């Protein structure tokens, strides 16, 4: 007998050699029916996995993240089975689960139409109704290659596996797929499925490879859950910054300008200007000094920093080292430039910390499949900065940086929407990271200790660090459920030495400083996208590009409307007047669609009494009030940065 420690701490004795599913059956038939996978000794395992020793075990149902992934992973195989039934000539690529669903990539002659997606969905339902058993089996490499000989992408995946790796397959009826799992015991629990869309995707995410057809879908154990999800998806589409931002005239794109290069229109530029002025003033108040550095540098600079070795593929390089005496690259970051400023003068320990800040235009050569609206672009604006400090100052400076980020998030009204991720290196990925295990271990321990001292609730993620050190990532989910990093705070253990940076300590000795890479608001474009989605375009008054719109009832009141505009502008309010010869109801509706915080209607009565008739986004129609009172009210709201 072996002892199984369950999630609630209770211990159950079972025979050795039982599968996770059989252990679930011994606990409860209901639990077994709803089981999707298990977490055995901290690792997600298939329900068929055999347990031979004392272990901790959690049975995962659809209510857990792990259970949902196994559930949707199985649904992706059902989709692949349906494709092979209806389009047997199509070739299989990969079909993982993702947050809120799954996708599968196929090599097909043409992308799937809406009609074909409907047919595939119906075929999936037929397969589920047939309820074939799901079987798992393993094969030696030569037999696996023979089984998959007609599936070139599967053959490539098998050949990519290291020698000695387990090669496993899952079978649903007569459909067999190469897969590591985990999967459900049967397809019957999939009661509701929906194929959402088809897009293009490069094999292995590399645009040098063939473009495949990717089908996205989602699945649930209850139809009511699917209906609720689809309803939420429709709401998300309404908030999608890529759609709403264009409708509101915040940004646009042009194919002749290029992908990943959005054009900020006057409204979008005004929003970013507002945020930038606020951030620069706040950073100055907190002791930062401003720098202004070039948009490009010689390759020599990036070779010193290590970016040339670890990040060259993500850079825009100007020139050819084999032909040109000097090769330049557009900067993907600001750090080496600010290090050059630091090195231009000698520093005593009394001069530290030095806090550099810069509103930096940066360039990154993102692949076409990665780019999306304002969230992932090739040119962006970052509230960048670097703190050079002594080891004794590191914790306080890190704490102050986190404090600034929290202040910014609270002021923007999104403090409750963010999560913290401690991103660490992967010691097996020496191409991506500086290979100094001792320094990595030491720096990661320092950061973990600081985060614990600050009582920050964080998760840990391997292989997500910067190449020169660990980082704290502030994460935000977009309307589609995808998690994006909006701000990072990094501890750098390597670049001070590479750039020969030092300070003179109290004994007159040269010492290496610590460096904190940080941002206060992140990439302005990404933050703008996040705010559009958070507020469904109805940005807080202090951020809104147009804070008030004045609507005269007719041309007779144009002069008074202009007088109202002038007074508001004099007090720093962003205001416009709508003098078009349209009916007032039409102009009010249009101003509402533009998410204007305040609509001010002026006619004969308002002109005579020096009033404005106020319609606010928050309270609706408020009636007439003295112009002076309204001006004071909106100025105070803007000054307080109310959300």
From Swiss-Prot:
Report the InterPro entries cross-referenced here.
aa-tRNA-synt_IIb, aa-tRNA-synth_II, aa-tRNA-synth_II/BPL/LPL, Anticodon-bd, Anticodon-bd_dom_sf, Beta-grasp_dom_sf, TGS, TGS-like
Segments of this protein annotated with the region Catalytic: 240-540
Supply the enzyme class, top level.
ligase
Binding positions for Zn(2+)? 335, 386, 517
- Please explain the role this protein plays, according to its UniProt record: Catalyzes the attachment of threonine to tRNA(Thr) in a two-step reaction: L-threonine is first activated by ATP to form Thr-AMP and then transferred to the acceptor end of tRNA(Thr). Also edits incorrectly charged L-seryl-tRNA(Thr).
| Family classification | Belongs to the class-II aminoacyl-tRNA synthetase family.
Provide the protein name: Threonine--tRNA ligase
The organism encoding this protein is Clostridium perfringens (strain SM101 / Type A)
Q: Which gene encodes it?
A: thrS
């Amino acid at each position: 007998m072996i002892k199984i420690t369950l999630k609630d701490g209770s211990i159950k004795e079972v025979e050795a050699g039982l599968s996770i599913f059989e252990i679930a059956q011994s606990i409860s038939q209901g639990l077994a029916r709803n089981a999707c996978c298990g977490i055995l000794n901290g690792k997600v395992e298939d329900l068929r996995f055999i347990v031979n020793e004392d272990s901790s075990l959690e049975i995962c149902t659809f209510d857990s993240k792990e259970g949902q992934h196994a559930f949707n992973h199985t649904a992706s195989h059902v989709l692949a089975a349906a494709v092979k039934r209806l389009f047997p000539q199509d070739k299989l690529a990969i079909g993982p689960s993702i947050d809120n669903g799954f996708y599968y990539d196929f090599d097909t002659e043409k992308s799937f139409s809406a009609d074909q997606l409907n047919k595939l969905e119906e075929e999936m339902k037929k397969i589920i109704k047939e309820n074939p058993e799901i079987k798992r089996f393993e094969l030696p490499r030569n037999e696996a290659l023979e089984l998959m000989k007609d599936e070139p992408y599967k053959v490539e995946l098998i050949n990519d596996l290291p020698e000695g790796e387990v090669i496993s397959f899952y079978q649903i009826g007569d459909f067999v797929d190469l897969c590591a799992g985990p999967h459900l015991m049967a397809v019957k629990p999939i009661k509701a499925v929906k194929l959402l869309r088809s897009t293009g995707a490069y094999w292995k995410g590399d645009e040098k490879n063939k473009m495949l057809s990717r089908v996205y879908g989602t699945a649930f154990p209850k139809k009511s859950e699917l209906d609720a999800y689809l309803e939420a998806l429709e709401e998300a589409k309404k908030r999608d910054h890529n759609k709403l931002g264009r409708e509101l005239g915040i940004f646009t794109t042009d194919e002749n300008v290029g992908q990943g290069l959005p054009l900020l229109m006057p409204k979008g530029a005004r929003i970013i200007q507002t945020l930038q002025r606020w951030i620069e003033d706040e950073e100055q108040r907190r002791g930062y000094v401003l720098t202004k550095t070039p948009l490009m540098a010689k390759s020599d600079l990036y070779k010193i920093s290590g970016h040339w070795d670890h990040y060259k593929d993500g850079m825009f390089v100007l020139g050819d080292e084999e032909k040109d005496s000097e090769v330049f690259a557009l900067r993907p970051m600001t750090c080496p430039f600010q290090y050059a400023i630091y090195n231009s003068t000698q520093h005593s320990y009394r001069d530290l910390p030095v806090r550099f800040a810069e509103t930096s235009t940066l360039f990154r050569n993102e692949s076409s499949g990665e780019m999306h609206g304002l969230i992932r672009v090739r040119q962006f604006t970052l509230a960048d900065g670097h703190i050079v400090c002594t080891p004794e100052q590191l914790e306080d400076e890190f704490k102050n940086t986190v404090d600034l980020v929290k202040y910014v998030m609270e002021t923007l009204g999104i403090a409750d929407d963010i999560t913290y991720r401690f991103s660490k290196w992967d010691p097996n990925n020496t191409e991506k990271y500086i290979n100094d295990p001792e320094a990595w271990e030491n720096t990661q321990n320092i950061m973990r200790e600081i985060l614990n001292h600050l009582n920050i609730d964080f998760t840990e993620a391997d292989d997500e660090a910067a190449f020169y050190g660990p980082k704290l990532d502030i994460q935000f989910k977009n309307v589609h459920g995808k998690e994006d990093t909006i701000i990072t705070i990094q501890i750098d253990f390597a670049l001070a030495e590479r750039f020969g940076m030092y300070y003179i300590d109290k004994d007159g000795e040269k010492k290496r400083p610590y460096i904190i890479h940080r941002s206060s608001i992140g990439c302005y474009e990404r933050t703008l996208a996040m705010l559009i989605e958070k507020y469904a375009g109805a940005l807080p008054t202090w951020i809104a590009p147009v804070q008030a719109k004045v609507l005269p009832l007719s041309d007779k009141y144009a002069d008074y409307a202009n007088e109202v505009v002038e007074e508001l502008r004099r007090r720093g309010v962003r205001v416009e007047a709508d003098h078009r010869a349209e009916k007032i109801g039409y102009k009010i509706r249009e101003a509402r669609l533009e998410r204007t915080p305040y609509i001010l209607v002026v006619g004969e009565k308002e002109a005579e009494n020096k009033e404005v008739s106020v319609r606010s986004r928050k309270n609706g129609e408020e009636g007439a009030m003295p112009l002076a009172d309204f001006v004071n009210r909106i100025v105070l709201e803007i000054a307080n940065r109310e959300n």
